[in-house]
C-alpha cells in the first residue's frame, strides 16, 4: 500500500499496487511526470510525455500509470527523473535513459532532442551502476567500485569536471572524487552533492542561492569541481537530498538542516533573515529518519511521532516562483500523514516530486513499531569478515569465480579498499586517520596466505590500483589509501619492489604540497608498527634497485623517487629511532667512488642537464650507517679538494699531503704554530706527521700516535685548557680561559683533522658538545653527564613539591667555575619557587652550555668546520658524531682475530700464531687496549674498522726468540718473532704493553 499526492490535491490518495503481493518499491518524479518501480521490477510511467519522458511508444500524456513495455524484460532496480528525462538502472548495473536529450542528459553519446524509447548508455557497459540521481538537465551515477560519473548540461559546473568542461553527452568520471569511499550521490536543479561513508559532504555546481552551503567572506556563485563543505563537516550527515535551488541534509541525531533558496518556504517555516548556510528545521516535533526534496518543497518522515510533514510549495501549488521572490506566506510545516492514518502500517519510504509525492508503507504486527524506517541505498563493494571467510573457503569453480570478481573489484579500487577499513566516527568527531590499519594488516595477512588470492591481489594492485592512485586529490579521504597499502604484505615482498613499492612511491612523489602535507601529518601520528612497515618497504625497494639496477636513466629516476619519498617520511618521523631508517646493506653494495664522481659533477656544475637529474646520495645520509657516512664524508672532502685544484691549477704542484714536522718535547707548540700558517686548501689533504729525529713524514708518518699524544696533553687537567667539574668527570670549556681564543680555534681544527683523517682521539667531552656541533640544544641529561651531582640537584629542584622548594633557599644566582653569576638581572634577590623552578633549571643549563662559553666555543666551532663540511656533518646524529671522533672503546676481539692477515711464512695455524692468540685473549681489557695502542698508536678502534681491522703479522728471518715484537702503527703491522713457548710469548706481550707509547722507526 502507498499514498500519493498529485498536483491540485489536498489529501493523500491511498492506493494498492494491484496484483497481490506486488508493492511499490520506488517512485521518482520530474517536473510533470513520474516513474513507479514495483517489487516485480516492472516500471510504470504517467504524466506529461511531450519530450518522451514516459518511455512509451506513443507521444501522448497519460494520467494513469502504464507499464514501460521496453523495460518489461529487464530487471529494473532503481529509477530517477530529471526535469524532462528519465533513467533506469537494471540488473547488473546496466543503465537506460529516455526523454529530452538536447543537453546530453541521456548520456547516449549524442545531443538527441527527444528519445521516446529507453536507450542503453553504452559508455557505462561493463560498469555496474548502483545509484543514479538526475538533476534538471544532468545526471549522476555511482558505480559498485566507487567511481562517480556525470553527464548532461554543465552550465553551472554541475558535472564537477572543471571550469572549461562543456556539456557532456557521454558519461565522464568525476576525477576529483576518485578514491573517496562514497555512500551517496544527489543531483539538484543545477547543483550536485556526494556524501562519503565518513559523513563528509562534497558539493559542486551552482551556489547562486546558497544551495552548496559555502562559507567565507567571498562566497563563489559556482564551484566547478567537488568541494568539501566545511559547514556540514561536524553535523554527522547521513543523507542528502537536493531540490531545484535548495538542499536538505539528515543527521545521525535525526535532525534536518536546510540551505539555499527559500522562495517557497522550502527551507523552514521562519527563515532567519539574512542568514546563509545550514539552518536547523525547528518545530518539527521529533526525530526524522527520512527526507526528500522536490523542486520547491521538502518532505520528512518524523519517526518518533509517525508523521510525514512537508515544507514549501508542494504538488497542490502550481505557480513557478523564482529565487528572487519572497518566501510564501503559507510556509508552515504541513502534516501530510498523521499517526492515525497509519493504523497497522508504518512508513517504509518517502518520495518527493514537483507535481507528486509518494509514501510507501508496510504492515506491522503491532500498533507501535520500535524500528526506524531509513532510506537504504545500495553501497559500494567492500571487504567484511564474512566475505573474507567466503573467499578463503571458495574451492569450487563457481564459488571461486564469484570470489575473484569481488576481490578484483575491491583491490582495483582505492575507494573500495579504503571503505573496507573505515573506523566508526562518533558524532562531531574528526579523526585524522579514519582507517583501521591494524584490522587491515590482519585481513591482508589472512587473505595472502591463500596463494591464488595473493596472486590475484598482486595483479590487481599492479595493473589497476597503483596506476590510478589519487595522488592529486585535494580531499583527505582519498589519500587514506596511501596509509593502507603498505600494510599489505605483498607490498613488502622484495620481488614486487618495481611493480608495487616503486609505483606507490612514485605516486607520493607526484603529490602537490597540500596532499603531501596531509600525508606527512598522518605519518607523524601513525603507530610505530605501521610507520615501521612503511619505512621497511621503502628500504627494501631501495636495496633492490641498487643491487639489480643498471645505471641507466630509469635507474636514476627510480632511485631518486624512492630516496625522496623516504626522506619525506624521515622528516615527518616522530616515533621511530633514527636507526630504523638506516640501510645497513648499503655499505656493502654501494659504489662510493661513483658517488664521489657525482658529487664532483654537481659541485662544479660540469653538466647542468645531467646535474639536475643526478642522484647524489650524500643528500640522504640518514639511510647510511656510520661507517658509510664516514666514507661519504671522505668523498665530499676529496671533491672539495679536486674542485679547488680545477679552479686553481697552480695548486696541482703543491704536496699531496698536509705535512706537520714536530718535536716530541714541544708537541703542542710546534703543532699550533704550523696550523696557524696552513691554508684552508691544505686542511682537506691527508695528514702526514713526522717526528723530528724519529720518522720522516715522507715515509708515511705516524698520524694515529700523533693524535693520541697531542690530545692526551691538551686535555690533561694540568694543561688547564679545559675544566673538569669533578675528578674523573667529562671536561668542558672554561668560563675564564687561560688561553687565547685562537687556541680554541686551532683545537677545533685539530678535532676536524682527526675526523677527516679517520683517526680516533681521546676527547672527554660529554654528548653536549656533539649536540652543539649539530646545532642541537643540550639538556639537563647532558649536564648530568658533565657533572652528575649538579645534574641530580637540579633534577631534585624539578621534583620538589610546591611547599618544599622555598625551604631550599635558592636564588637565580649560581656558582660555576669559581665564579658567582646571576642568571637574570638581580638574580641574587629572586628566590626559586614552584612557579619559576623550570625557568631556573633551564637558565642554569643554558648558562653552562651556552652563555658562559659563547666566545671560545664559537672559535672551536669555526675551527672544526674549517676542516669538515657542515652539509655532511649535519646529517649525523650526536651519538654518531661522537663515535666517529672518539671511536669505540669496546671491541669484538674474536672478530679482531678473524680479520687478521699473515705474511712471511705465517698463517693462522702456525704454532707461534696459535700461541699469540691464546696469550692475547688471556689479557685483561686494559692490557688489550694498551696492546692496541702499541700496535696502532691508539687504544681504541675507529668505527670504520670495527668489521675489518685486525693485525698484519710478519716475521723477518733475522729475528730470534730474544727479540721483542715491533709495530708499524700506520699499517697495523706486527713484527712477531717465532716464539716457541707460551712463557716467552706472554713475556713479549708484556714488553709491548708496557712500552706502548713512542714511535717505532719504519724499516
From Swiss-Prot:
Its EC number(s): 2.3.2.-
Identify the domain of life.
Eukaryota
Q: State what the entry records as the consequence of deleting this gene.
A: Abolishes global ISGylation.
Q: What induces it?
A: By type I interferons.
- Keyword set for this entry? Cytoplasm, Immunity, Innate immunity, Repeat, Transferase, Ubl conjugation pathway
Q: Which GO terms describe its cellular component?
A: cytoplasm; cytosol; nucleoplasm
Q: What would be one Pfam family of this protein?
A: RCC1
**Where is the protein found, in the record's own terms?**
Cytoplasm, Cytosol
* MF GO annotations: cyclin binding; ubiquitin protein ligase activity
**SUPFAM superfamilies assigned:** Hect, E3 ligase catalytic domain, RCC1/BLIP-II
Active site per the UniProt annotation = 970 (glycyl thioester intermediate)
Which windows of the sequence hold RCC1 repeats? 40-91, 92-144, 146-197, 199-252, 253-303
HECT domain span? 679-1002
Polar residues bias spans: 261-273
Q: What does this protein do?
A: Major E3 ligase for ISG15 conjugation. Acts as a positive regulator of innate antiviral response in cells induced by interferon.
Q: What is this protein called?
A: E3 ISG15--protein ligase Herc6
Q: Which organism is it from?
A: Mus musculus (Mouse)
Amino acid at each position: 500500500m502507498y499514498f500519493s499526492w498529485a498536483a491540485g490535491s489536498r489529501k493523500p490518495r491511498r492506493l494498492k499496487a494491484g496484483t497481490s503481493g506486488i508493492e511499490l518499491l520506488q517512485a521518482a518524479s520530474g517536473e510533470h511526470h513520474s516513474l513507479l518501480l514495483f517489487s516485480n521490477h516492472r516500471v510504470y510511467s504517467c504524466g506529461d510525455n511531450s519530450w518522451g519522458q514516459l518511455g512509451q511508444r506513443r507521444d501522448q500524456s497519460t494520467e494513469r500509470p502504464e507499464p514501460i513495455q521496453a523495460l518489461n524484460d529487464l530487471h529494473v532496480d532503481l529509477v530517477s527523473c530529471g526535469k524532462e528525462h528519465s533513467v533506469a538502472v537494471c540488473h547488473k548495473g546496466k543503465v537506460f535513459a529516455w526523454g529530452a536529450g538536447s543537453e546530453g542528459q541521456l548520456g547516449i553519446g549524442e545531443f538527441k532532442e527527444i528519445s521516446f524509447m529507453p536507450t542503453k548508455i553504452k559508455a557505462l557497459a561493463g560498469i555496474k551502476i548502483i545509484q543514479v540521481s538526475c538533476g534538471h538537465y544532468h545526471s549522476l551515477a555511482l558505480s559498485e567500485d566507487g567511481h562517480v560519473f556525470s553527464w548532461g548540461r554543465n552550465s553551472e559546473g554541475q558535472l564537477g569536471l572543471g571550469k572549461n568542461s562543456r556539456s557532456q553527452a557521454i558519461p565522464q568520471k568525476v576525477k576529483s572524487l576518485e578514491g573517496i569511499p562514497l555512500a551517496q550521490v544527489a543531483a539538484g536543479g543545477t547543483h550536485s552533492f556526494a556524501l562519503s561513508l565518513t559523513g563528509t559532504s562534497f558539493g559542486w555546481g551552482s551556489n547562486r542561492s546558497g544551495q552548496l552551503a559555502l562559507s567565507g567572506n567571498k562566497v563563489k556563485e559556482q564551484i566547478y569541481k567537488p568541494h568539501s563543505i566545511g559547514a556540514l563537516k561536524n553535523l554527522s550527515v547521513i543523507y542528502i537530498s537536493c531540490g531545484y535551488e535548495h538542499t536538505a541534509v539528515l543527521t545521525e541525531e535525526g535532525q534536518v538542516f536546510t540551505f539555499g533558496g527559500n522562495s517557497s518556504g522550502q527551507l523552514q517555516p521562519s527563515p532567519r533573515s539574512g542568514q546563509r548556510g545550514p539552518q536547523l528545521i525547528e518545530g518539527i516535533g521529533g526525530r526524522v529518519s527520512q527526507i526528500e526534496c522536490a523542486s520547491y518543497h521538502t518532505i520528512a518522515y518524523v519517526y518518533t511521532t509517525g508523521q510525514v510533514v512537508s515544507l514549501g510549495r508542494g504538488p497542490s501549488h502550481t505557480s513557478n516562483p523564482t529565487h528572487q521572490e519572497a518566501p510564501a506566506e503559507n510556509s508552515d510545516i504541513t502534516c501530510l500523514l498523521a499517526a492515525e492514518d497509519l493504523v497497522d502500517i508504518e512508513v517504509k519510504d518517502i518520495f518527493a516530486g514537483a507535481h507528486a509525492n509518494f509514501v510507501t508503507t508496510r504492515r506491522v504486527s503491532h500498533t507501535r513499531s520500535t524500528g526506524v524506517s531509513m532510506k537504504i541505498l545500495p553501497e559500494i563493494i567492500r571487504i567484511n569478515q564474512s566475505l573474507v571467510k567466503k573467499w578463503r573457503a571458495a574451492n569450487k569453480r563457481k564459488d571461486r569465480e564469484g570470489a575473484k570478481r569481488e576481490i578484483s573489484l575491491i583491490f582495483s579500487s582505492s575507494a573500495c579498499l579504503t571503505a573496507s577499513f573505515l573506523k566508526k566516527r562518533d558524532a562531531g568527531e574528526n579523526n585524522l586517520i579514519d582507517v583501521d590499519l591494524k584490522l587491515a594488516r590482519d585481513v591482508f595477512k589472512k587473505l595472502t596466505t591463500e596463494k591464488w588470492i595473493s596472486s590475484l591481489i598482486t595483479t590487481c594492485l599492479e595493473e589497476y590500483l597503483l596506476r590510478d592512485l589519487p595522488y592529486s586529490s585535494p580531499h583527505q579521504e582519498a589519500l587514506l589509501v596511501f596509509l593502507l597499502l603498505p600494510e599489505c604484505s605483498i607490498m613488502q615482498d622484495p620481488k614486487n619492489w618495481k611493480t608495487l613499492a616503486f609505483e606507490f612511491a612514485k605516486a607520493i612523489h607526484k603529490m602537490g604540497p597540500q596532499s603531501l602535507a596531509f600525508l606527512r601529518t598522518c605519518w607523524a601520528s601513525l603507530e610505530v608498527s605501521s610507520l615501521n612497515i612503511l619505512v621497511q618497504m621503502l628500504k627494501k625497494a631501495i636495496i633492490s634497485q641498487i643491487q639489480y639496477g643498471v645505471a641507466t636513466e630509469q635507474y636514476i629516476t627510480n632511485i631518486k623517487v624512492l630516496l625522496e619519498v623516504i626522506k619525506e617520511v624521515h622528516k615527518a618521523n616522530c616515533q621511530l629511532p633514527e636507526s630504523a631508517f638506516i640501510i645497513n646493506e648499503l655499505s656493502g653494495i654501494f659504489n662510493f667512488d661513483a658517488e664521489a664522481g657525482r658529487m664532483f659533477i654537481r659541485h662544479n656544475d660540469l653538466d647542468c642537464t645531467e646535474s639536475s637529474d643526478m642522484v647524489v646520495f650524500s643528500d640522504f645520509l640518514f639511510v647510511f650507517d656510520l661507517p658509510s657516512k664516514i666514507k661519504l664524508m671522505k668523498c665530499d672532502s676529496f671533491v672539495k679538494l679536486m674542485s679547488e685544484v680545477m679552479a686553481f691549477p697552480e695548486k696541482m704542484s703543491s704536496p699531496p699531503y698536509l705535512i706537520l714536522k714536530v718535536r716530541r718535547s714541544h708537541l703542542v707548540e710546534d703543532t699550533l704554530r704550523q696550523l696557524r700558517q696552513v691554508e684552508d686548501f691544505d686542511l682537506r689533504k691527508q695528514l702526514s706527521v713526522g717526528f723530528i729525529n724519529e720518522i720522516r713524514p715522507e715515509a708515511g708518518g705516524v698520524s694515529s700516535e700523533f693524535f693520541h699524544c697531542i690530545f692526551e696533553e691538551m686535555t690533561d687537567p694540568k694543561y688547564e685548557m679545559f675544566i673538569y667539574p669533578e675528578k674523573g668527570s667529562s671536561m668542558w670549556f672554561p668560563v675564564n680561559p687561560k688561553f687565547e681564543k685562537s687556541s680554541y680555534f686551532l683545537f677545533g681544527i685539530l678535532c676536524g683533522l682527526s675526523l677527516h683523517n679517520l683517526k680516533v682521539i681521546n676527547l672527554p667531552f660529554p654528548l653536549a658538545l656533539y649536540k652543539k656541533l649539530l646545532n642541537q640544544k643540550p639538556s639537563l641529561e647532558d649536564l648530568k653527564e658533565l657533572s652528575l651531582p649538579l645534574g641530580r640537584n637540579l633534577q631534585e629542584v624539578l621534583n620538589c613539591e610546591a611547599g618544599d622548594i622555598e625551604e631550599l633557599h635558592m636564588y637565580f644566582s649560581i656558582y660555576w667555575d669559581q665564579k658567582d653569576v646571576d642568571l637574570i638581572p638581580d638574580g641574587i634577590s629572586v628566590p626559586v619557587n614552584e612557579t619559576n623552578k623550570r625557568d631556573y633549571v633551564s637558565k642554569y643549563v643554558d648558562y653552562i652550555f651556552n652563555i658562559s662559553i659563547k666566545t671560545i666555543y664559537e672559535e672551536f666551532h669555526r675551527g672544526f668546520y674549517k676542516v669538515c663540511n657542515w652539509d655532511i656533518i649535519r646529517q649525523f646524529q650526536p651519538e654518531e658524531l661522537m663515535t666517529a671522533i672518539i671511536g669505540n672503546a669496546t671491541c669484538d676481539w674474536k672478530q679482531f682475530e678473524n680479520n687478521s692477515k699473515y705474511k712471511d711464512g705465517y698463517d693462522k695455524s702456525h704454532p707461534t700464531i696459535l700461541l699469540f692468540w691464546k696469550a692475547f685473549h688471556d689479557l685483561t681489557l686494559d692490557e688489550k687496549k694498551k696492546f692496541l695502542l702499541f700496535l696502532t698508536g691508539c687504544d681504541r678502534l675507529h668505527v670504520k674498522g670495527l668489521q675489518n681491522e685486525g693485525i698484519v703479522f710478519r716475521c723477518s728471518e733475522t729475528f730470534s726468540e730474544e727479540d721483542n715484537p715491533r709495530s708499524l702503527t700506520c699499517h697495523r703491522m706486527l713484527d712477531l718473532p717465532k716464539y716457541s713457548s707460551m712463557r716467552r710469548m706472554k713475556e713479549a706481550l708484556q714488553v709491548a704493553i708496557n712500552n706502548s707509547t713512542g714511535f717505532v722507526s719504519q724499516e
